[in-house]
């Protein structure tokens, strides 16, 4: 096929594909994908210099390795982050925050039993580390242990009922047990909340109070800069993907999970598990196919 004809064919296919979608998607809300900042690069260089020094105590070295791992993770450099976390744990095996990150990576890799053990270790070392309930609950959710997932995510919700994303994750877990009851509980949580955080708009969509178009219009109006727009899009597209997945619309779900990932908000739970959702949907994800044995 001649290049010009090939381009015409592709353009026509894209146009027809667009026509099958809802009209508002013709003006899709997009953000510039987040990129590493100069400050982050400078901090990494400085950390490298300090770690090369022999003047650090074991505790200082373990803490700095952990902090560099967190920075690597925020940049999407998971292999480097895992390496730093593993080194930190070898020096200080009593760091709950390190077990928490390793548990997240194990969940993303689908190694659920090892993830449960990692999060159990977090709570054994620090019973007040509440985010371990979120992360273990998510691991249990993807691992098919629905009632245990509900227990963890309920504990996480109760720690801050005004956080909409706690209500959303609890809803996703309870939806697998009793969809009608789960929606009623979500409605109660919405009515009791202060409704101040952006994510309650997503809850309103789940409850059928607003349309998808209204949700996206509110998202665009609420964003103060490109960073907040990218973050809101990562969150919203993930939960929209879960919504369409529950309806059996795999094409829309796949597209939305890809949009959630495209914003490069690597340290958001929605980015992490959009990648896992794509893997479960059979998408080729080299990053997820790698071995996550710790």
From Swiss-Prot:
According to the Swiss-Prot or TrEMBL entry, at which residues is a lipid covalently attached (S-diacylglycerol cysteine)? 19
Where on the tree of life does the source sit, at the highest rank? Bacteria
Consequences of knocking out this gene: Highly sensitive to osmotic conditions in low-salt medium and also thermosensitive under low-salt conditions. Shows pronounced filamentation at 42 degrees Celsius under low osmolarity, but not at 30 or 37 degrees. Growth in low-salt medium is severely restricted at 30 degrees and no growth is observed at 37 and 42 degrees Celsius. Shows increased eDNA production. Produces 100-fold more outer-membrane vesicles making the organism more resistant to toxins, and enhancing survival under stress. Higher sensitivity to ultra high pressure than wild-type counterparts.
- Which InterPro entries does the UniProt entry name for this protein? Lipoprotein_NlpI, TPR-like_helical_dom_sf, TPR_rpt, Ycf3
Tell me where the transmembrane regions lie. Answer: none
**UniProt induction comment:** By L-arabinose. By high-pressure at 400MPa for 5 minutes.
GO molecular function terms attached to this record: protein homodimerization activity; protein-macromolecule adaptor activity
- SMART domains recorded: TPR
Which sections of the protein are TPR repeats? 62-95, 96-129, 234-267
Annotated signal peptide: 1-18
Q: What else is known?
A: Processed by Prc protease in the C-terminus.
Q: Which PANTHER family match?
A: TETRATRICOPEPTIDE REPEAT PROTEIN 6, UDP-N-ACETYLGLUCOSAMINE--PEPTIDE N-ACETYLGLUCOSAMINYLTRANSFERASE SPINDLY-RELATED
What is the protein's name according to its record? Lipoprotein NlpI
Q: What is the lineage of its organism?
A: Bacteria, Pseudomonadati, Pseudomonadota, Gammaproteobacteria, Enterobacterales
